[in-house]
């Protein structure tokens, strides 16, 4: 199955206070668990503006990281766990589980910004 870069649906309204996880579709491969190295394709969008700030798809290479080891923002460490390879999941990550009051990306992510990611688990 060939997957393509997803469009991110902008929910509007008030951002959630806690991590919101929604499976867009569930994969049928191995389950991602803490301590494993995972490979994730993603699109990231700012909740307040709907503007895309980053996407691994644009680089053609998924992001590899050790799950649960603090190599990525907390919302990812929590939100990717339990995904199955081949699955796509939407994560809405409040600032305290993302970049907090410091923002990131050279101004692309504002301080206190809630983030929306659509993540595809490519491999574990």
Curated annotation (Swiss-Prot):
Keywords: Isomerase, Rotamase. PROSITE patterns: FKBP_PPIASE. Residues 35-124 form the PPIase FKBP-type domain. InterPro entries: PPIase_dom_sf, PPIase_FKBP_dom. Its EC number is 5.2.1.8. It is an enzyme of class 5 (isomerase). The keyword Isomerase applies. Inhibited by FK506, ascomycin and rapamycin. It catalyses: [protein]-peptidylproline (omega=180) = [protein]-peptidylproline (omega=0). The keyword Isomerase applies. GO terms for molecular function: peptidyl-prolyl cis-trans isomerase activity. Belongs to the FKBP-type PPIase family. PPIases accelerate the folding of proteins. This is FK506-binding protein. The gene is fkbP.
């Amino acid at each position: 199955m060939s997957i393509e870069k997803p469009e991110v649906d902008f929910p509007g309204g008030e951002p959630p206070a806690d991590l919101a996880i929604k499976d867009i579709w569930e994969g049928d491969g191995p389950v991602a668990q803490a301590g494993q190295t995972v490979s994730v394709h993603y699109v990231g969008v700012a909740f307040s503006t709907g503007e895309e700030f980053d996407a691994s798809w644009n680089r053609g290479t998924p992001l590899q990281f050790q799950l649960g080891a603090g190599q990525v923002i907390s919302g990812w460490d929590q939100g990717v766990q339990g995904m199955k390879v081949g699955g796509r999941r939407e994560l809405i990550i409040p600032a305290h589980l993302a970049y907090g009051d410091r923002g990131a990306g050279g101004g692309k992510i504002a301080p206190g910004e809630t983030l929306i990611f659509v993540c595809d688990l490519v491999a574990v």
